[in-house]
Amino acid sequence: LTPVAPDALAETYGGGGGAFGRHFDAILQARRRESDEFYAGVIPKSLDADATNVMRQALAGMLWSKQYFYYDVNRWLEERGCDPYLPSAKRAPRNEQWHHMYTSDVISMPDKWEYPWFAAWDLAFHVLPLTLVDVDFGKQQLDLMLSENYLHPNGQIPAYEWNFSDVNPPVHPWATIYTYRLEAALRGKGDTEWLERSFQKLLLNFTWWLNRKDRAGKNAFEGGFLGLDNIGVFDRSSPLPTGGYLEQADGTAWMALFSLNMLEMAIELSLQDRTHADMVLKFIQHFVSIASATVHAGGNTGMWDEEDGFFYDVLRLPDGQAQRLKVRSMVGLLPLCAVTVFEGGFQEKFPEIAKKFQGFLEARPELKTFIHDPTRMGHAGRRLGAILDEVKLRRVLEKMLDENEFLSPHGIRSLSRFHAEHPYVFNVGGQEYRVPYLPGESDTGMFGGNSNWRGPIWVPVNALIIRGLLQYYAYYGNEFTVECPTGSGRQMNLYQVAEEISGRIASLFLRGKDGRRPVNGGEQKLQEDPHWRDYVQFYEYFHGDHGAGLGASHQTGWTGFIARGLHLFATTTAEQVLELGKGAAFEEVNPQEAGSGTNPAPR
């Protein structure tokens, strides 16, 4: 507020006016005015007062969640008798493979109260709202995870402090290409040097995934934990009680998205330097192979279930048998998110790449039969990299948009409500494993017991679904419509579906017609007291039926995406998406003229 030390305030500004001197109020009001002016340039004017308040508090929470993080892992391990070069009878409690890691940085935390340590995949989501107010800080956060002090020499990105060797979803490439495009829109030119540097480091991470998580070399990936805590039948970070291993629908979908994001970067870099053109072909081939494995690998015991029209994890046993674990969860929706639309024209600029890719498909014609045909042109000559063809996309959307399954009043649930009456049960070795629908808090101690992916709404995966729907819309256009909600008789194009889901998420925080905010649940003080009711908390996750906030109560972190969601649909129209493709999300427009200008609550 002032550069003057507290004990010099009276002498500098004069006595009176309380402990801070008589000029304190004027200084405070000046800072308030400056803050108001800053946010007025960020928050779209088409948002109403309540939505404006929510967006501003979400952004403020993102900035408040910065924290200095110091951790000398080598020193910590040495104090516990762990030497990187000598075998030791005393095993370190954790992170004994991370002697190289040394952190002394300001990092965006998930929740400075409950989770005062970074998590790699959380951080990637943090960048989306953070870059609305500070692009440079967002880039710096992404740089940290790829720096020599963090990235393992083998290419692994550290997961989180409790176990750096655990595996988080590889969303770093997505955040990287997103940030590059946002900065290019804001400043008129993308930072290709930064993109090139990030691309080279992410190549190491991609190779680590290929070498460590594709056990059979068939592009069907494992991954383990992958950030979704208790979503599976078993603890995915531990050995299976059955023996064998899991082929994970989400792990394979994440790698398909990773390939697409790397392909986007390679194309962008090739436009500046043709020596990257071979990388374009490399990642096209990777994507097609991984996407085909998601749909086809294993034949009748692959991840795609033709009868159910859904994706499941596959348990592969030591004796060669395989079984789908038929849990309808976010795991089966994530393949929908592995999609990217590409503008036309690249083939003309790089005919040699187009020719080589065509030869690759002619040599492997079966690959194209299982997934969306990547050579088929859509709206405005665009092409689509997607696991799901139109038929499979409609089948998955039918379940996702069913209010008796995934679609809640406040977003997409992490587990289908179908399992409320039909819990999934798996018996092995005399022990029963159950996955019921739990819309609130967890009923087990798995991963500490303070999070739950068996029914609640989680904002980050909803963000990925919204992104995916907009990619499909830019390709299919207005002709592709689905019932939303399923069974309602109301047809929507995919832009409208994305906007509907975003509006339902926003309704968690906005006052409803009854004046109450679902996030505050039954807390009457928070709902009714004028001193509390307009101060919004951004929880870790939300009740799958009524939307009450659960888990860490100050996790603006990835829940801070709501700021980006509000901004996106207030500044981007369906017409712009059809005209500009994914570039529409970064188009700078007058907020008063942009978007529908409607309240972002459910329609």
Question: Which positions does each model-derived feature cover?
Answer:
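Acidic, mature catalytic/reactive cores of soluble proteins
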Residues: L1-R603
